[in-house]
Regions:
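Accessory beta-strand-rich segments of carbohydrate-active enzymes
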Residues: 3-15, 45, 49-150, 175-176, ...
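Substrate-binding clefts and catalytic carboxylate motifs of secreted carbohydrate-active enzymes
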Residues: 4-5, 11-15, 75, 123-124, ...
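Active-site-adjacent substrate/metal-binding segments within catalytic domains
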Residues: 34-60, 65-83, 89-92, 141, ...
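Short, hydrophobic beta-strand segments
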Residues: 102, 206-216, 665-671, 764-783
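Extended acidic/polar, glycine-enriched regions
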Residues: 107-109, 169-252, 670-673, 682, ...
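Short flexible loop/turn segments that cap and initiate beta-strands
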Residues: 179-184, 219-225, 631-633, 639-641, ...
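Short aromatic-acidic-glycine turn motif
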Residues: 189-196, 655, 700, 742-758, ...
Length: 818
C-alpha cells in the first residue's frame, strides 16, 4: 500500500469566475470571500458569505494495476469528486470523511484531471463559522485488491494490570481468492507483542497479550507503536501504522468515571473546529499548538463542538494527554438554520456516525461519543427513537466507549410546548443585516435592566432546566444514553441524584463564570463526572455573543457587522488566556500565583453593555497609555484565603479570595504608571505573588515565534506573536496601529490578524492593526530547505524581524494517522 498526502499543487477558483489560483491544501475558501453587512449568513459566520468553488489537480497515474482511491478528511460542503470529467463520489455533509474510488476512471501511465466541486452557496446552513472548500487533508491511496479498510482497525483494551489484554478487529476488503493473513504487533521499546490470524469474510479478530503494560491517561500519555500487516504467501499486501494507548473506561453513578480504574474528573473545554486567523483550515501544527496551550492552562478534556474533531487534533490529544468527547452534529431532523444538515439527516446520519467512530476508535484520548447538541426534538417520541437507533449504531461499531448527547433541558421544555427558540436568533440576524459597514451601529440600547438580564442568562437557563416540565421533556432521552449531557443545567445536579439515582451526568456545556459552583458539585457528587465550559478556546462566528460593548455600541445578543469573533473563550483566538481562564485555574487549584486583571482603560466604562457568555471584560495588563488618572477596576483571581494588592509598594488593601469570595478579589484605585503586585496568602502565610508593570521608555515592535525550525513539507506552520513593547518587554495596550508583515525565503504568510472582535481587514492580507498591543502571524513552510525571514513593520514603531529555518530532516510532524 502507498498512502500519499495529496495536499500540494492544486488550482482553486470561485465557480462564478474563470481566474484560478495555485493553492496547497488545507484551504479555506470562505476566508477569501468579502465580508458584508448584507451577508445572508449574518452573524452566524461573522458576516462571511458562502459560495461555490472548484479545486483541480493534474496527477500522473502509475502504470501498475491496483486499487486507487482518494480519501478526504473534510470538505465543506456538498462536494462532488470528478476524474477526467466523470463523477467518482462526494459527500453532502461538511464534516464527514469520505473515500472516492477512482481506479476505474483513470488512464494508467498518463495525466489525469482530478476536480472537486464544492457548493456552500445555500445560506445560512451553520450557526457558526464553517469555512468552505477542502479544509482538511486529502490522501491518495494506492492498494492491492486485498486491503485493510480505512478506519478498519479497531483496538480495545479488555484488561489492564501488569499485563494487558487487547482485542483487535481488522476489517479487510478481500477481493481475491488468496489465503490472507493479518498480523498485529504492538511495541514500546523492547520486543513487540503480536498476534496473527487468518482473514475470514470481512476481516479477522485477534487477541494480543502485552507484558509490562504501560497505561495511557491524560496525566501519562504513553503510546505504543502498532503495525498491522495484511499478507499472503509471505508478501505484504497492505499495512497500516498507528499509535495506540492502553486505556480502559468505566462509568457509573456510584463511582463516577474511571480511566484505568482511577477516578477521573473532566476539566473540559468546548472547542469549535476553526483555527482563528487560519479560518476553517486544519493544520497539524496549529492543532498541536492548541492542544498544548489547553493542556498547559489546566484543561484535561475537550468537547468537539458540534462536529467531529480532526484527525490531527486527535493525534495531539493522544500525544499530549487530553480526553476527547467527539460530537457528531448540531442537528438531527429539525433545522436550526434554513439550509442546515437537518434537511438530509435521514439519508446521512448512519454514514456520518460511522465515519466519526471509525476515525476515533483507535485513539485512546476518545472516551465519549456525543450523538448531538441541543437537539430539542429529543424531547419527542420520534426524537427518542432516533436517539435509540443512533446509540445502537455507535455501539455496533465501538461498544467500549460510552455515548452521550448535549441536551439543553430548557430547549426541550420549550419544544414540548411547540416553541422553537432558535427562530428568535434568526430574526435577530435579519435585523442586524441593516447595520452599516463601518463599525458597529451605535444606538441607545444600554440599560440597567438589559445588563441584569444578560448577566443572569446562565442562571435563568439553569433555573428553567430545574423545572419538573424540563425533567419530563428530557428523561426519555437520558434513559437512552450512557452519560446524560446537561447543557446549562447545573441546578439539577444535586436533585437528580435522588430523582434518577442511576444517571451519570456530565456538564456538556456551561457558563465559564459558573465554574466555581459547578466544580464544587463535580468534586462532591460522584454521579457528576465533569464540566465543559463554553468555550475553552474562542472561535469565529456567532459574532459577539461573548463580547462586551460600550456607550452607544450595539448591545444585541449577536452583534452586527463587522463583528466576527464570538468572544466567550477562556483563551482567545490567538492563544492568549484571559480572565475566565484565570478563574478556572484558581478553582481547579492549578497555581498558587494570583492572576491580576484590569478592566480596560481604553474604553468608556460608565456605559457598559455586558455579554451573556462573559462575566468580565478585564485584561491582564497595567500598561494603559490612555489610563493616567482614570479609575481602575482590578480583579485578582486566586484560590488563597486572601489577596493583598500593592501599587508601587503602597498597599491598596487586603481582600478575601478563594471559595468564600468566588475566587476573585476586587480592588479600585486611580491608574498611575507604576507597578502592581498581588500577594496571595493562606492563613497569613504568603503562597504566591505576581506583578503587572506599566510602560517604561520608548515603544517598539517585537516579533516572537513558537518554533525556530519548521519541517519543509509544505504543511508545517509557525505562529509568530507581533507585539508593541516598552524597553522592559511589557506589551502596551494600544490598538489601531497599522502593521505590515513580509515573508521572504522558504515560507509564505498564511494568516495575519489579532483578537479584535470586530476587525475591518482580512486575515488573508499582509496588513492588519494591533489590538491591545498584539497581533499574530502564521507562516507556512514550503517544501524547500532554507531560511524564512519574517519582518513586521509599523509606520510609527519601526520594524522587527526573526529568521526561521526549514528542514527536511525532522519527522516529528509526520502525518501517520490511519
Amino acid at each position: 500500500m502507498t498512502r500519499t498526502l495529496f495536499d500540494l499543487g492544486w488550482e482553486w477558483r470561485n465557480a462564478d469566475t474563470a481566474a484560478r489560483q495555485l493553492v496547497d491544501l488545507p484551504h479555506d475558501a470562505m476566508l477569501h470571500e468579502q465580508r458584508s453587512a448584507s451577508s445572508a449568513n449574518g452573524s452566524h459566520t461573522g458576516w462571511f458569505p458562502g459560495g461555490r468553488y472548484v479545486y483541480r489537480k493534474t496527477w500522473r497515474a502509475p502504470a501498475d494495476p491496483g486499487r486507487v482511491s482518494l480519501f478526504f478528511e473534510g470538505v465543506y460542503r456538498k462536494s462532488r469528486v470528478l476524474v477526467n470529467g466523470v463523477e467518482a463520489g462526494g459527500c453532502l455533509g461538511g464534516y464527514t470523511e469520505f473515500e472516492a474510488r477512482i481506479d476505474h476512471l483513470i488512464e494508467r501511465g498518463s495525466n489525469n484531471l482530478i476536480e472537486v466541486h464544492v457548493d456552500n452557496s445555500e445560506e445560512p446552513n451553520s450557526r457558526w463559522y464553517s469555512g468552505s472548500g477542502i479544509y482538511r487533508h486529502v490522501w491518495l491511496l494506492e492498494q492491492s485488491s486485498d486491503r485493510i479498510k480505512p478506519g478498519g482497525v479497531h483496538l480495545v483494551t479488555r484488561a489492564l494490570g501488569g499485563t494487558a489484554s487487547v482485542s483487535a478487529r481488522v476489517e479487510v476488503d478481500n477481493d481475491s481468492s488468496r489465503d490472507v493473513q493479518v498480523r498485529v504487533s504492538m511495541q514500546l521499546g523492547g520486543s513487540p507483542a503480536e498476534a496473527t490470524a487468518s482473514v475470514a469474510p470481512g476481516g479477522a479478530e485477534l487477541e494480543i497479550t502485552v507484558p509490562d503494560a504501560q497505561p495511557w491517561s491524560a496525566e501519562s500519555p504513553v503510546l505504543y507503536d502498532v503495525l498491522v500487516e495484511l499478507t499472503a504467501d509471505g508478501e505484504v499486501l497492505d499495512q497500516q501504522e498507528l499509535r495506540y494507548g492502553l486505556r480502559t473506561i468505566d462509568v457509573d453513578a456510584s463511582r463516577g468515571l474511571r480511566i484505568n480504574s482511577q477516578p477521573t474528573l473532566l476539566r473540559g473545554a468546548c472547542i469549535h473546529h476553526d483555527s482563528g486567523i487560519l479560518g476553517g483550515a486544519t493544520f497539524r501544527a496549529a492543532e498541536f499548538r492548541r492542544a498544548r496551550i489547553l493542556r498547559e492552562q489546566g484543561f484535561n478534556a475537550v468537547r468537539s463542538s458540534h462536529n467531529p474533531i480532526s484527525r490531527d487534533m486527535l493525534d495531539a490529544c493522544d500525544e499530549l494527554g487530553l480526553y476527547v468527547m467527539d460530537e457528531s452534529s448540531d442537528v438531527w431532523f429539525r433545522t436550526k438554520t434554513a439550509h442546515d444538515a437537518a434537511l438530509h439527516f435521514d439519508e446521512t446520519w448512519e454514514a456520518e456516525l460511522e465515519a466519526m467512530v471509525r476515525k476515533d476508535r483507535t485513539h485512546p484520548s476518545v472516551i465519549m461519543y456525543s450523538i448531538g447538541n441541543e437537539i430539542a426534538e429529543s424531547g419527542t417520541a420520534e426524537g427518542i427513537e432516533a436517539a435509540r437507533r443512533m446509540v445502537a449504531h455507535v455501539k455496533s461499531l465501538d461498544a467500549s466507549v460510552p455515548v452521550t448527547c448535549g441536551v439543553n433541558l430548557m430547549l426541550n421544555m420549550a419544544a414540548a410546548r411547540g416553541k422553537n427558540l432558535f427562530a428568535g436568533h434568526e430574526k435577530q440576524n435579519a435585523k442586524n443585516q441593516d447595520a452599516t459597514a463601518a463599525r458597529p451601529k451605535r444606538k441607545a440600547l444600554t440599560s440597567t435592566g438589559y445588563n441584569f438580564l444578560v448577566s443572569k442568562l446562565g442562571s435563568l437557563m439553569a433555573r428553567a432546566a430545574a423545572l419538573p416540565a424540563a425533567d419530563k421533556a428530557s428523561r426519555g432521552m437520558f434513559d437512552v444514553l450512557d452519560v446524560a449531557g446537561y447543557n446549562y443545567a447545573h441546578a439539577r445536579y444535586r436533585k437528580d441524584r435522588t430523582l434518577h439515582p442511576g444517571r451519570v451526568i456530565v456538564g456538556t456545556e456551561t457558563m465559564p463564570f459558573h465554574i466555581a459552583g459547578n466544580w464544587a458539585l463535580v468534586e462532591e457528587l460522584p454521579h457528576v463526572i465533569g464540566d465543559f465550559m463554553w468555550t475553552g478556546w474562542d472561535y469565529l462566528g456567532e459574532a459577539g455573543i461573548g463580547t462586551w460593548t460600550y456607550g452607544d455600541e450595539s448591545a444585541s445578543f449577536a452583534k452586527p457587522y463587522p463583528y466576527l469573533v464570538a468572544g466567550p473563550g477562556a483563551i482567545d483566538i490567538t492563544g492568549n488566556p484571559g480572565a475566565p481562564m484565570a478563574l478556572a485555574r484558581a478553582v481547579w487549584g492549578q497555581t498558587d500565583e494570583p492572576a491580576i486583571f484590569v478592566r480596560p482603560l481604553d474604553r468608556d466604562l460608565k456605559r457598559t453593555n455586558r455579554a451573556a457568555w462573559r462575566a468580565t471584560d478585564a485584561v491582564a495588563s497595567w500598561a494603559w497609555p490612555e489610563g493616567e488618572g482614570r479609575r481602575a477596576e482590578i480583579e485578582v483571581y486566586s484560590n488563597a484565603d486572601e489577596v493583598e494588592l500593592r501599587l508601587d509598594g503602597r498597599s491598596l488593601g487586603v481582600r478575601r479570595a478563594g471559595r468564600r469570595a468566588g475566587f476573585v478579589a476586587r480592588f479600585r484605585t486611580a491608574y498611575s504608571s507604576e507597578t502592581l503586585v498581588a500577594i496571595a496568602r493562606v492563613q497569613g502565610r504568603e503562597v504566591g505573588r505576581s506583578t503587572l508593570a506599566s510602560a517604561v521608555g520608548p515603544l517598539a515592535l517585537r516579533i516572537r515565534s513558537d518554533k525556530g525550525v519548521l519541517d519543509a513539507d509544505g504543511q508545517d506552520v509557525a505562529h509568530l506573536a507581533v507585539e508593541l513593547v516598552d524597553s522592559a518587554g511589557t506589551v502596551v495596550m494600544l490598538s489601531g496601529e497599522g502593521l505590515e508583515v513580509s515573508v521572504d525565503g522558504t515560507g509564505t504568510l498564511t494568516g495575519l490578524g489579532s483578537a479584535d472582535p470586530a476587525p475591518l481587514g482580512s486575515y488573508t492580507d499582509a496588513r492588519t492593526e494591533l489590538f491591545r498591543g498584539s497581533a499574530l502571524a502564521v507562516v507556512r513552510a514550503t517544501t524547500e530547505q532554507g531560511e524564512v525571514r519574517v519582518t513586521a513593520r509599523s509606520r510609527v514603531y519601526g520594524e522587527s524581524s526573526v529568521t526561521l529555518t526549514t528542514s527536511i530532516a525532522s519527522t516529528t510532524g509526520e502525518l501517520i494517522h490511519a
